Amino acid sequence: MSRKDSTSSTEAIADVIRERIARGAPVRRTLPGRGRLHVDRPLPFITVHVEPDDRPDAGTNQLVTTEASYLYSIAERGGRKQAAELVRVLSETVRPSFGKQFLIVAVCSRPPEHPPVVESSKDTPHPSFRLFTTAPGQNIDSIIEVLERHLKAIEIGGNRAAVEVVQNGGEFPHRDRPLLKNAVLRELGAAQITIEVEPIYQMSGANDVYPAVLKALRRQLGRALKHAFFYFAERYTSLHPKDFHSLGRRAVVKAVWDVDMQLDAVANGFDLLLDVNPINTESVWNGFRRSRFEKVPPFRYRPLSTDPVMAKRRLYSIPFEKIEDPTISFLFSQKQDELGRQLTMLTDRGTVRFLLGSIQLYGRVTQPLLRSAEQILEQVSSTTRAAGGGGTITAEEFADRARAEVAHYRDIWDGVDGTVQVIPGVSSGLMVSKNRLLVPSRSRIPRNRVDALIQHEIGTHLVTYFNGKAQRFTLLRSGFAGYEELQEGLAVLAEYLTGGMTPARLRTLAARVVGVDAVANGASFVDVFRLLCRYGFSRQQSFNITTRIYRGGGFIKDCIYLRGLLTVLDYLREGGEFEPLFVGKIAARHIPIVRELQSRKVLEAPKFLPRYITRESCQERLQRVRQGLDVHELLG
């Protein structure tokens, strides 16, 4: 590009900045030579990287793209001059709205001529940073202190970051001197901080990167930058953000929606629960009984509706590298890993390998969880009868009650498209598959459990599905990675809150944990069956529980009901909010991420909460949970 073309391009982009910022609109422009300007919304700061023209510098530009306002360019062919002019125009345009202050944070990698802050190697990367400041006319020592503190919290490969501060007048890195001259900074009321980063993410020669190291550094550096921007905004501007998360990106680019849709398409292409559910349970029970409970006939499964190999090909061809937002990239990467493991389990269905994949997906039973389960089985009598009406209702009667509950939510939002289907061939009890509640045609539902089961299946599983559907991310309806534990914990809690928790139900949850632990440690079907019989379960009950655990070849999922319940009880006891748990299908570890995305206005509050929560009796029970109710006290 000629100097004339560069000047013309700069002027055109500057005009776009002025026009769009005046309207409060985002600015996203490609700059010459692989550069990019992204301004999510008017903000009194920007992160900048200008790639040097005298050495390779792979990956450093990605360190600034975590922010809501960033620019990266290359020094050659006037790129540095263009970057300086665009930053000047941006500062000049936005600062009147924020008290006439503006902060520029430039990020560069440590040049070879600069000594490292601390010795590091490619085998044992040690993160470090050197801060250079220039702040004519104002004192930003406190901002430097905030940035330094949060940079020191960065940890890569078990090593905490080292930070060196070079105050005003210090020698700036070659080619990374202040982007704007002091006179211009003074005129704008702006300050610049330059962060020199130890390039631990670069391979030898700096032409390529270590992806995992770069990903970890991006996310942690982005968090440190937001803390510094938050402090700056609070102290020097009129912005006054709610929290540091709220300064993150709000505009979600097309690449994110494309990846979201592709992940959701893979997730909706199969149903692991249905695919590992035996279709011949009744004949297996009859054969097992005829053998005097010594030999188990083989389970049969429905044909797979998807080719796991082809699904994996689609899964791993999704272009995750186009996502700049580290939080969203993290969520999507987790889901990709989970889907890959689930597809492998489909391939291994009916083999010993299925159990290994199941353990990878759901984890083993811990000793504290096992002790809780054993205590329940020992302390809760198998002969205790629950209070309430006796008798049972048919599958069709239950389905009618469930359809009425779905209709309640449809009256609130016409996006509710849930259905209730009575079907043959499902043997593991009530089951939600996406937006459908499946009711086995042979089911007989105890009357005193009807409401509890409706709130378990519809008030939790379908409500979170529809709340997820109402969000911008389709993945919230199919579920973030590992969502099932929190889901099942919430669903079981709903049974207690609606007064439907019975001794038999609590014992069943505990029996699943004991059985899963036995299976994971090599016990056979007959071994687990006999173990449950010794705990006081009938032969039919023992067979049903063992069948759930052994479906597919060893399905560890059943331990998450009690584990999830304990997680939810702890969360609420510690003062956790109820509402975020229903934003969609999420895991407990995603709660802070949900709060971050809500602060950034990427996610909204749940469209609705389960209907049962408005009942006075439920509120009273919820209060008891918050006061520290133990799992054994759920029967009180």
PLM-predicted stretches and their roles:
Residues 1-153:
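Long, charged/polar, low-complexity intrinsically disordered N-terminal extensions
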Residues 177-187, 194-356:
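Extreme N-terminal flexible tails
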Residues 454-463:
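Active-site His/Glu-centered metal-binding helix of metallohydrolases
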Residues 286-287, 448, 463-487:
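Post-HEXXH active-site segment of zinc metalloproteases
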Residues 310-442:
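Contiguous, non-catalytic segments that form substrate-binding/exosite surfaces or channel walls
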Residues 477-516, 564:
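Post-HExxH zinc-binding segment in Zn-dependent metallohydrolases
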Residues 505-636:
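Conserved alpha-helical "signature site"
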Residues 439-454:
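Short pre-active-site segment immediately N-terminal to the catalytic Zn-binding motif
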